[in-house]
Amino acid sequence: MKKLKKISTVVTAVIVLAGCTTTILPKKDGAQTDYAGQFESARKQLQIAEPAAREDKQPLILAHYMPWYEAPPVSEQYGFHWHQGGSKFDPYTTLADGRASIASQYYPLTGPYDSKDPAVLEYQAALMKMSGIDGVIFDWYGVRDALDYKSVHEATVVMVDILKKYGLKFAVCYEDQTVKHMIEGAFIDKADGISTAKEAFTWMQEHWFADENYVKLDGRPLVLDFGPQFFTQKSEWEEIWADVNPKPFFVDIDNRTNFADATFNWPPMHLSSGGRLAIPRLVSYLNDFYGKQNAKPFLVGTAFPEFHDIYAQAGGTSYGFLDYSGGETFKLTYDAAEQARPDVIQVTTWNDYGEGTIVEPTIERGYTSLEYLQDMRKKRDPDFAFSYMDLRIPIELYRAASGTDDAKKQQAEEIYAAIFDGDAETVQNLTRSAGIDYDFSVHPILRDAKESAQKEIAAVFDPAGKRNLALGRPVVVSSRIYDFTGAKAVDGDLSSYWEGASDRWPAEFTVDLISAARLTTAVVKLNPQRIWGKRSQTIEVLVSADNETFTSLIPPTPYIFDPSANGNAIAIPLDTQARYIRLIFTANTGAKSGQIAEFEVYGE
């Protein structure tokens, strides 16, 4: 259900950690509702038989982790996963309560962050260590520079180093559907699909699989797949793994294949009715899923707290809603997984803010899920020393590590060192001696609401009532990526756009004005929102009377598009007679092809 889309933007940094700290008590959803009583009945309906082929053991607790977030100042832009396209949410906008306008039902205590920010990753790893999580399963897409895959890979590499410092384990959920997306986006040819996946597994073998912190099952490196969705034949995977030794321990989703070594489950939102997944239906699914795994020697079970996505509010389609129910949904799904005696319990997810399946602390949910995981760890390991109160320390360490006081940064480093040593007593003593205050309340980092406003920008061209000759006219382009067609650049909607195929230069855009006219001005616009950051596009302008012979009117020229300076629009003087007008793009500092949200032409 993961959505992989792209907006290419380059933005200027803003202050995201200045501003205030507000004390917020986490919401108690339905405080008058007896969720525990309701779920006691649901637990009685769980019918998970003792597995014939799996012994009782301590499963690894691994959090499914999304390394796909981008934010200033670490990155030049807010990535797609914080704004979901920007038509409804703009992280540059600060709401009245100090939160950034992000595409999520939930708000991280740190505010929107970058997955390559060491301060954020240290904070997250410390929380995992203190809650009893053994490591993470990275959502990972290979090593190609396509869409945001390169950024995801770079963030994963940074987080792996931090996890290893904390003695935490890691594995990968490889999404083979990303190869399909690369083919559809013309990043690779269809014939190169197998070799692209093979490249990813070769990289993992060379850099991760032999690592002592990489999770192994049956002596082989654990690899999950959210599918398979593209490579569905066993022979394809055998070719992909031909040079990988030992062969990965391959785990598909929900019995998708007959050749995987094991399977894992996920919130079954396809079973929703009327937009809602009812608990009895969830219980029936859990009984069915784990029943099918009874005779299998290995299992990855999954625990999830809820499913509350933002997709409908962002302009898309929701997958449905699974109620948090005061934390009882998480307890139910964890209990079901534990009864099945899995090798791994996958916590879904640490931080998928789009789908709303988060256990990372948020303003809305506080630390509830991590407290439960801590309880489960103490049940398995009574000597586990970290407490509920200790979970409140990392946000204060993050605050110090992200600040400018070198003494506080040093104190934070010392406390982090004690956390990854697992020394709860030293953590508490150092925190007290550093004068760090913390309590059971939620203390998010919020902005000053004064940061919000985007100044008015004067239009680069005033048509003075003249008709846009290009509006709705036929367009021919040399290439496009996905459904970003040429027609979207003449539809009068700045939220839609044309973009050429990746690295297929030059990118040509030709519009037929239907009849010849004396042309005076062409206007090229991008979305004016700040998530479409400053960039330079090199454009040549050509004209024609017959669509056969084109004359270069303006040679290749770099034009600056800047939402803060010109509203992401440029005006090009023409002064010519023509029916057809062609733009040839040869460079774009903000994307891998030409981009136009609206192309307007005016004349006499």
Language model: regions and residue ranges:
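Extracellular carbohydrate-recognition regions
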Residues: 462-478
